[in-house]
A protein has these predicted regions:
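Asp-box/WD-like beta-propeller blade repeats and closely related beta-sheet repeat scaffolds
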Residues: 179-212
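Extended ligand-binding clefts on enzyme/binding-domain cores
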Residues: 204, 215-323, 330-341, 353, ...
């Protein structure tokens, strides 16, 4: 029994008889002092043999050392960021297409530049943007632009996977100037904002790919049509993917319960999909003005989702690929965990979430990201490959890396550095 299921079960021996593994050091002493952990219970915990060799003090010390979270400094976090990003950039060329997976990495890289002011890292994103001529999909004729199903062709101009690149192009324009950098973004997103259609975002990933583009376009133009279109498009997304009971999102209409169930007949919320959404909402609120009439709608959605996400975390700090059914595809996964960690950190850092309430969730997630996901080389492992659902039996291990997973890790790490400086 693990995770939320164990937390809700009064008969779970881990919870009722061995709370020291989730409490602070002072709680450990309190439990022993009040005799809430009788000697006989050690048998069931496979510690009886240890007591023959170690004193009770040694047992307490061992438990304390295993539980006590490392106390990070901002400088140490910055070192981790450099290690991860340097490893990625040294092993992967910048000159790749502007499709979503590469573009998601660059949203993390730009956050690194904002924090570290490392010109070499900035240059990596500039070279990527120049290679793609500051464009997503390149079809020139709006009459041929598509979006209603998945497509990697150059005519899928209105498909969100070809629009996430505009986030980085806009950021680079703000830093460096030159309107040629945003010419295509203005053309494509202006067309979408002016259109009568609102069914553009039919899969959860799009809420990270495009929602932040809309708020960045507002910042560029001071035109609320981008915010209004963001709201209208999101209402459509909610109508087909949002689970009203939990505040979480199904990946798309195919996965809505009970049409599709997890291996154990539960609602199948895909961690990376919901990670895209929570992170996207954080980015939206970053740029959305407090004065915008719909802003409370987005704040409520973000805070409700954050609490729903926190309830699904596993004791080891990660989220399983199927969030409510850990046994569907068991084991750690980094991309969803990193996006969740970023979203929760952003919420705390910007006063949208209570620090005391979410600090334990954040610290567990950060511990997983740095002690399990992060490899000695700087590689970020345990990233589920490109897909759209939790797949039973799929291999996800220390060698499983991906550009978007690195981007998610960098977002979380940058926000964690700020989190430490706010203490």
């Amino acid at each position: 029994m693990t995770g939320a299921a164990c937390q809700k079960n009064a008969d779970c021996p881990f919870i009722t008889n061995f709370n020291l593994f989730t409490n602070t050091v002072s709680d450990i002493y309190r439990i022993f002092a009040k005799r809430k952990l009788p000697y006989e219970a050690l048998v069931g915990l496979n510690l009886i043999n240890m007591t023959k060799k170690l004193s009770l003090l040694a047992i307490i010390l061992w438990a304390t050392l295993s539980l006590q979270a490392r106390k990070w400094t901002p400088a140490e976090v910055r070192d981790v960021i450099r290690k991860v990003n340097t490893y990625w950039q040294q092993n992967n060329k910048a000159e790749v297409r502007s499709f979503w997976d590469n573009a998601a990495y660059h949203t993390g890289n730009m956050e690194v530049y904002k924090l570290l002011k490392d010109e070499q890292m900035l240059d990596y994103s500039i070279r990527w943007a120049e290679h793609n001529q500051w464009m997503g999909a390149t079809e020139a004729d709006p009459a041929k632009w598509k979006y209603k199903r998945y497509g990697e062709g150059q005519d899928y101009v209105l498909f969100g996977d070809w629009q996430i690149c505009f986030q980085t192009y806009i950021d680079l324009y703000v830093l460096l100037g030159d309107e040629s950098k945003i010419k295509r973004a203005m053309e494509v997103m202006g067309y979408e904002a002016d259109s009568k259609a609102n069914d553009y975002w039919w899969w959860a990933d799009a809420l990270y790919m495009v929602m932040p583009v809309m708020t960045k376009m507002y910042r560029l133009t001071d035109d609320e049509k981008y915010l209004d279109k963001l709201y209208e498009n999101l209402l459509y997304s909610d109508s087909i993917m949002l689970d009203q009971e939990t505040g979480l999102y199904f990946r798309d209409g195919k996965y809505v319960y009970p049409k599709l169930k997890s291996a154990n007949s539960k609602k199948d919320f895909w961690a990376r999909g919901d990670g895209w959404v929570l992170a996207g909402l954080a980015k939206v609120l970053q740029d959305m003005p407090e004065s915008y009439i719909r802003q409370p709608f987005f704040v409520h959605k973000f805070t409700r989702m954050a609490r729903a996400v926190a309830k699904c975390q596993q004791p080891q700090g990660y989220w399983t690929r199927s969030m409510l059914d850990p046994n569907h595809a068991p084991g750690p996964e980094t991309s969803g965990t990193a996006f969740f960690c970023y979203g929760l950190l952003w919420g705390v850092n910007h006063g949208r979430l209570d620090r005391k309430e979410f600090a334990p969730v954040i610290e567990r997630a950060w511990k997983y990201l740095t002690e399990t996901a992060l490899q000695k080389s700087g590689k970020v492992g345990y990233v589920q490959p490109i897909g759209e659902r939790a797949i039973p039996g799929q291999t996800v291990d220390a060698n499983s890396e991906a550009n978007f997973g690195v981007g998610a890790f960098l977002l979380a790490a940058c926000e964690y550095e700020r989190y430490l400086r706010k203490k």
